Amino acid sequence: MIQFVIPSYQHVGAVSALDMFPTDYEPHIVVREHEEKAYYDAYGSRAKIITIPDDVNGIAGTRKAITDMYAGQRIWMIDDDTTIRMSSMRKRDDRRCVDKVNQLTREQFYELIQYVEDAMDCGYYHGHARLPIFKITSSWGNYRENSYGFTNTWYDLGKLTTEQIGYGKIDLCEDMYAFLNLINQGYPHLALFKYLVVSGKAQAPGGCSSIRSNSKHNRALEQINREFPEQARWKTSNIEKRKSLGEEDESLKVLRMCVSRKEKSEAFHKFNAIHPIAVD
């Protein structure tokens, strides 16, 4: 069964991701050694607390450590302020909406697990449930291939190695790097719309915000652009208006993903035969 893994740092008392799990499922929270007791006291009855050394570098290093520790397993890494919910189509404007009120029931949670287990069996060794920032219509279907997203990612670590994923090769924007890195090795990515996520406020205190700044963020994007120039392209409009990640003069840069392909993968055809892409 898929193991949910929640990397967390300086967020004792704010791990809202735990709200999505039924009582008979044990998620794992991965924390620095010096925070083990605080997290255990707060969440030990609801999750297994896993430690990594204090000197692990940032969120990218944390994700690398997780892919090392869980080698051979199927995992789903999810931000500590993120929960996965059901979605439905709103007929009046043909918009897919996330259920912001209700968590998954126990039955729905295990259906989600099976849905992604099926995706992995079909060849989708990495994927995510979408954060609905932009409008998702019925024409998008229940999922889309090679569409980038963040806040959560699943991996079949029986099929993918830490080296193949590439965490730790870039300090920030590590999920974007891993997404492109795996696609370019021939591993398609699956973005789910049937299930959507509710996530906390961007750059809340703690977590990766403790090491993020405009300059560090921009240097990471520049590295991604150098390695994947055709698929990670600069978005030039409204850069000056982007919210700053810190009190700096440097404007925040933005990349847009250009990776969609008309020809679908073998994994897509296998998964579509089990779970049709078309909205009911």
Swiss-Prot record:
<comment type="pathway">
    <text>Genetic information processing; DNA modification.</text>
</comment>
<protein>
    <recommendedName>
        <fullName>Beta-glucosyl-HMC-alpha-glucosyl-transferase</fullName>
        <ecNumber>2.4.1.-</ecNumber>
    </recommendedName>
</protein>
<keyword id="KW-0808">Transferase</keyword>
<keyword id="KW-0328">Glycosyltransferase</keyword>
<dbReference type="GO" id="GO:0006304">
    <property type="term" value="P:DNA modification"/>
</dbReference>
<comment type="function">
    <text>Transfers a gentiobiosyl-group on a hydroxymethylcytosine residue in DNA. Is involved in a DNA modification process to protects the phage genome against its own nucleases and the host restriction endonuclease system.</text>
</comment>
<dbReference type="Pfam" id="PF20691">
    <property type="entry name" value="TAGT"/>
</dbReference>
<dbReference type="InterPro" id="IPR049100">
    <property type="entry name" value="TAGT"/>
</dbReference>
<dbReference type="GO" id="GO:0016757">
    <property type="term" value="F:glycosyltransferase activity"/>
</dbReference>
